Swiss-Prot record:
PROSITE patterns: DHDPS_1, DHDPS_2. It comes from Histophilus somni (strain 129Pt) (Haemophilus somnus). GO terms for biological process: diaminopimelate biosynthetic process; lysine biosynthetic process via diaminopimelate. This is 4-hydroxy-tetrahydrodipicolinate synthase. The gene is dapA. CDD domains: DHDPS.
């Protein structure tokens, strides 16, 4: 049970980036999404992370979207900026552009495609942290990046003052204990896998950076509040209701299904994504509809 609240905790949305039918960021829809999360009790928002299609936005678009998210939030909810890149220089540029923005933290993914060694990952994150005072959250998602940031390396990185936590998306709940052992109990562990998020909180994790939260924000916030209070049986009831969503929102590559689900629920006016991502296939749509019904959202 968490007896005090760390800097980042609870149900944190990996926010989708709404687009209009010209493929441009829809800032009116974005404003409505921010309000939805504030009203629903979401504990923080990640702007332009993986789910926010950071890889297909330019640096200028990334920064503008983050700044608009901050503007819409108006201090009512912490905003974490997705600033990761597979080039260290690009990640540093993004981070520096936000130094005086008021973001609560930066989420920085393990460099993808070029497959750095553990030493390379250490040097990458160290260089980013040294260019800013903004708290840094590491992001490990080997299924996308091709590289696994090991607990031993996380332990080394935790010695850098403004590297405060990790989004761990391997789905391996044993990582909670391993990372806490290497980095210390105060190092923030946030699950990046909805399916095992509650289990990781039972083992000492402080929250979930969630895809499901985009469309079931109130339920995810309540589940995490119960878990943080040690009321795991009650939290499990909510998690059971969302279990099909946790799974089926990955029936095609994220964020394809969750963006379509948000459209189906009227949270965004269009399910449009930028190429090479395409809208959810017709054959997958009934499964998402069933999952939404099982969760009581339709």
């Amino acid at each position: 049970m968490t007896t005090h609240r760390p800097l980042f905790y609870g149900s944190i949305t990996a926010l989708i980036t709404p687009m209009n039918n010209h493929g441009e960021v829809d800032f009116n829809a974005l404003k409505k999404l921010v309000e939805y999360h504030i009203v629903s009790g979401t504990h923080a928002i990640v702007s332009v992370g993986t789910t926010g299609e950071s890889a297909t936005l330019s640096i200028a678009e990334n920064v503008k979207t983050i700044l608009k998210t901050l503007e819409f939030a108006d201090g009512r909810i912490p905003i974490i900026a997705g600033t990761g890149a597979n080039a260290t220089s690009e990640a540093i540029t993004m981070t520096k552009l936000l130094n005086d923005s008021g973001v609560a933290g930066c989420l920085s993914v393990v460099p993808y495609y070029n497959k750095p060694t553990q030493e390379g990952m250490y040097q990458h994150f160290k260089a980013i942290a040294e260019c800013t005072d903004i708290p840094q959250i590491l992001y490990n998602v080997p299924s996308r990046t091709g590289s696994d940031l090991l607990p031993e390396t996380v332990g080394r990185l935790s010695q850098i003052a403004n590297i405060v936590g990790i989004k761990e998306a391997t789905g391996d709940v044993s990582r909670v204990a391993k990372i806490k052992q290497m980095a210390g109990e105060d190092f923030i562990f946030l699950s990046g896998d909805d399916a095992t998020g509650l289990e990781s909180m039972k083992l000492g994790g402080q929250g979930v950076i969630s895809v499901t939260n985009n469309i079931a924000a109130a339920d995810m916030a309540k589940m995490c509040e119960l878990a943080l209070a040690g009321k795991f049986d009650e939290a499990e009831i909510i998690n059971d209701k969302l279990r099909a969503l946790h799974k089926d929102l990955f029936i095609e590559s994220n964020p394809i299904p969750v963006k379509w689900a948000a459209y189906k629920l009227g949270l965004v006016p269009d399910p449009i994504l930028r190429l090479p991502l395409t809208t959810l296939s017709e054959q997958a749509q009934p499964k998402i509809i069933n999952a939404l019904k099982n969760a009581g959202l339709l």
